[in-house]
């Protein structure tokens, strides 16, 4: 279950289904990612075709990422069965 979301627009999408804070062409994929994160109990639950799940390195070690589109990612970390620090980033 998602416990914390860093990105204000992503939080608005998750809590209120209001996509004004995210890129409009990403809204549908972001809804899918958030729904799957909310239902996920383990990181393996996020290994879905098209998400390109991968662990992050360096300063972001401990986080995982899934692809939204091009260079946009949703990053997050797991603690027990909870999903924490969900963020929506352009990594370039």
Pin down the residues of each PLM region.
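Glycine-rich, flexible loop/turn motifs
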Residues: 1, 9, 18, 42, ...
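Arg/Lys-rich, positively charged N-terminal/basic patches that mediate binding to nucleic acids
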Residues: 1-33
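Residue-level marker of positions within ordered structural domains that often coincide
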Residues: 15, 42, 81
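Generic alpha-helical scaffold signal
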Residues: 24, 28-31, 47-50, 70
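Short, surface-exposed linear patches
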Residues: 25-27, 60, 87-90
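Conserved phosphate-interacting/catalytic interface
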Residues: 37
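A short, surface-exposed loop/turn module that caps and links secondary-structure elements
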Residues: 41-64
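Enriched for short, Lys/Arg-rich terminal
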Residues: 54, 65-92
């Amino acid at each position: 279950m998602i416990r914390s979301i860093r990105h204000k627009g992503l939080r608005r999408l998750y809590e209120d289904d209001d996509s004004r804070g995210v890129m409009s062409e990403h809204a549908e994929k972001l809804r899918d990612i958030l729904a799957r994160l909310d239902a996920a109990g383990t990181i393996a639950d996020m290994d879905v075709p098209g998400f390109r799940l991968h662990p992050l390195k360096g300063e972001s070690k401990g986080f995982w990422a899934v692809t939204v589109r091009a260079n946009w990612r949703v990053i997050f970390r797991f603690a027990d069965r909870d999903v924490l620090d969900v963020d929506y980033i352009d990594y370039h």
